[in-house]
Amino acid sequence: MKITDQLIPTVIESTGRYERAYDIYSRLLKDRIVFLGYAIDDHVANLVVAQLLFLEAEDPDKDIQLYINSPGGSVTAGLAIYDTMQYIKSDVVTICVGQAASMAAVLLASGTKGKRFALPNARIMLHQPLGGAEGPVKDVEIITKELLRIKNLINTILSEKTGQPLDRIEKDTDRDFFMSAYEALDYGLVDKVIESKRR
């Protein structure tokens, strides 16, 4: 068990008749908010996918808000979230708080067009998928071919979602490519930088 697992706040709601305790993530879910605040692995992806499917089943015509503060992670796990976002009927509003790096940046850009946001001090980072291979040469060839396929897939998604030419995406993702919220806006990763919900 990670230390952060022990620090999840509980929210208590009171009505005239009873009290009910929720962990903070369950309480946010009541308001159609999903919070991706960890590195993306299969476990995290399964939780996010389940929440997206639940909220769509509850009301497919209402938006789902996906808040992102993640360093990225597993591409295959991230693609499970991406595919679900594209599959469900509900619009998915993406909001970057803190950072959206690597696969998390792909998810940020994959929200519903016109509904992709970043807070002013957010950081977004793109790069090529990471991987490695060892073993017999034939196995290394197989793994290399798959890594190149995934790299091309991610670059194609980013090109479609940002409107940037594929060759620019390929150049920019060749190494870590950091952007401020406003640079991400100019790049087409987000549609607006939001300073306050009050405005």
UniProtKB/Swiss-Prot annotation:
So what does this thing catalyse? Hydrolysis of proteins to small peptides in the presence of ATP and magnesium. alpha-casein is the usual test substrate. In the absence of ATP, only oligopeptides shorter than five residues are hydrolyzed (such as succinyl-Leu-Tyr-|-NHMec, and Leu-Tyr-Leu-|-Tyr-Trp, in which cleavage of the -Tyr-|-Leu- and -Tyr-|-Trp bonds also occurs)
The record's annotation in PROSITE patterns points to:
CLP_PROTEASE_HIS (PS00382), CLP_PROTEASE_SER (PS00381)
GO MF terms, alphabetically ordered: ATP-dependent peptidase activity; ATPase binding; serine-type endopeptidase activity
> What InterPro entries does the record point to?
ClpP, ClpP/crotonase-like_dom_sf, ClpP/TepA, ClpP_His_AS, ClpP_Ser_AS
Q: Which domain of life is it from?
A: Bacteria
Tell whether Cytoplasm is among the UniProt keywords. yes
> Which keywords does UniProt give here?
Cytoplasm, Hydrolase, Protease, Serine protease
- As recorded in UniProt, its EC number(s) are 3.4.21.92
**Location in or out of the cell:** Cytoplasm
The family classification in the record reads: Belongs to the peptidase S14 family.
On subunit structure and binding partners, the annotation says: Fourteen ClpP subunits assemble into 2 heptameric rings which stack back to back to give a disk-like structure with a central cavity, resembling the structure of eukaryotic proteasomes.
Q: Which NCBIfam families match?
A: clpP (TIGR00493), PRK00277.1 (NF001368), PRK12553.1 (NF009205)
Under what name is this protein listed? ATP-dependent Clp protease proteolytic subunit
